[in-house]
């Protein structure tokens, strides 16, 4: 009887598409002392694999991070229970690959076809190839660049502390390479988009439309085609009461008087504090989501430019990403955690579905894994990027800064992170580096 109590009946199953990883679904007894490693040994034995494959395990949709005994105890179950245990291939550690050096803090990143675009505190947008060579530089912003996004293989958009967005042409015979750049700063600006009254800190693109989030509490809605937007007179738009500083800023941006200036299609107003991020809904281009320092998540109808839902939390929200297949929004906060929300839930329903805990400072950027709908990565002012599987409340891996000059709490803040297929997990911050960590083919064979 003592031996029976030290075992529990387990029924293994998997959703892996590779049928060579499927075991018979007959239940068997397993020692309650087993953790992931011991359970992985059982699966490998049942499969008879020549090369062992590490596995992770889930019970009731949650990753197992303790022994079976601890799980039974936490759930108030006896060892007579039958546990349905799902197994899935374990994830490779996001090992360090390389870094690119930038002139100043790296504040924004995006990944396109075989290229990376970065925004920096020196006001310059740069495109890089995957070998680390700067292909082009785009000068024009008069303050830090806070957001960048590829529109297509030939165009991109940026937003910055100078309160403007800029549409750029990335391929143009008139655009010279870095070593020939002098004197061509404005040659490849398609249009300057004006209308915000404070820094522009986030942009998103879907089709021919752009969204921008600003510290003026508003969201800008723009077109990727300058012909769709109303022209702005560069000086008249300032008004007679404009400060001398504002007029000076405007003169600095008027080196090329022929640069088009355009007004937004609309400004979306409802937030009561700076808007930190705005994104298009993945399944509906007429819907957008935003998060703000006013503690709220808002849903917008872009056809009517109206806020149609507001969900209030207890903390400033600083970043957001959608998990499309799960229909959830992950939000990074000033309270150092990541919260998961269902934007479809009724306002009277539970606001927060789940919390991911582990960061020690603001969570300022998020992105999803291109290979797994349950996984995401987060960047924080605590100097780390964390990798998460939302089926566990704690992170799977923590990525630290690799540059030797980094001092904890001095110059280690991470401002931007992207997770892209064929590239990996890339991050940028105060260390003036774009750091690459393995994030492609993440499952062990």
Swiss-Prot record:
The keyword Repeat applies. GO terms for cellular component: nucleoplasm; PeBoW complex; preribosome, large subunit precursor. Residues 99-445 are annotated as: Sufficient for interaction with ERB1 and association with 66S pre-ribosomes. Residues 8-89 are annotated as: Ubiquitin-like (UBL) domain. It comes from the Eukaryota. Keywords: Nucleus, Repeat, Ribosome biogenesis, rRNA processing, WD repeat. GO terms for molecular function: ribonucleoprotein complex binding. Pfam families: NLE, WD40. InterPro entries: G-protein_beta_WD-40_rep (IPR020472), NLE (IPR012972), WD40/YVTN_repeat-like_dom_sf (IPR015943), WD40_repeat_CS (IPR019775), WD40_repeat_dom_sf (IPR036322), WD40_rpt (IPR001680), WDR12/Ytm1 (IPR028599). HAMAP family: WDR12. Component of the NOP7 complex, composed of ERB1, NOP7 and YTM1. The complex is held together by ERB1, which interacts with NOP7 via its N-terminal domain and with YTM1 via a high-affinity interaction between the seven-bladed beta-propeller domains of the 2 proteins. The NOP7 complex associates with the 66S pre-ribosome. Interacts (via UBL domain) with MDN1 (via VWFA/MIDAS domain). This is Ribosome biogenesis protein YTM1. It comes from Eremothecium gossypii (strain ATCC 10895 / CBS 109.51 / FGSC 9923 / NRRL Y-1056) (Yeast).
